[in-house]
């Protein structure tokens, strides 16, 4: 959300506002922010209206679930304390309205790159986080935001980030197929991270969905207890947008 225009942020808020009457839970699948780090007394500026809308939804009894992504790993206790959000740091298997879901950002099941796994382990290491927290935010925020935006732009420009790779090469699909062999009770695998929209049958009782993003597709997933489907929030924009994958659970 750091690099968005005011109009785009308002669009995001209107989308959350449109579901407040019938949603029972909202699940954000990671990378809610381009960069987020919580010091003991300092958090990133901005996001007031968006976080205010989430607080309003939480006050109405709607559960707010947030998976950490690879861009906002360093969420700690600020959002749980301020808006009652539930933070998930790894994949989660959960029953929702009668079906079994396997949820995650998606980078958790990417076992292809040793370098990526090493960086991820360093970023999640508590001692490394403690060392990083000792650096003044004047230096860390500018550097990290620049790195994050660079990483996102270069990633979206790569062919890998633009196109579906096929069942045998798309690593989330490969993971889901293997996992399903030992956990046949999973009805839906749902991930973000890849910036593609995908809805694929894995078996007669199981599907995998990759939720797209809010930079290109303005996409989200709805589960009402009977039907699970992907939809898009359609409104004219002025070009750039922001990554935001979510699941909206309604009753």
Stretch-by-stretch model annotation:
Residues 1-9, 13, 247-251:
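Single conserved hydrophobic/aromatic residue that forms the stacking wall/gate
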Residues 96-97, 223:
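Structural motif
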Residues 7, 35-40, 157-165:
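Short, basic, glycine/proline-bearing loop/turn elements
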Residues 10, 14-96:
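Core catalytic region of metal-dependent phosphoesterases/phosphodiesterases
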Residues 82-89, 102, 107, 112-126, ...:
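Conserved beta-sheet core of the metallophosphoesterase superfamily
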Residues 227-237, 242-246:
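C-terminal or late-domain output modules
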Residues 106-171:
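Active-site-proximal loop/helix segment associated with metal-binding centers of metalloenzymes
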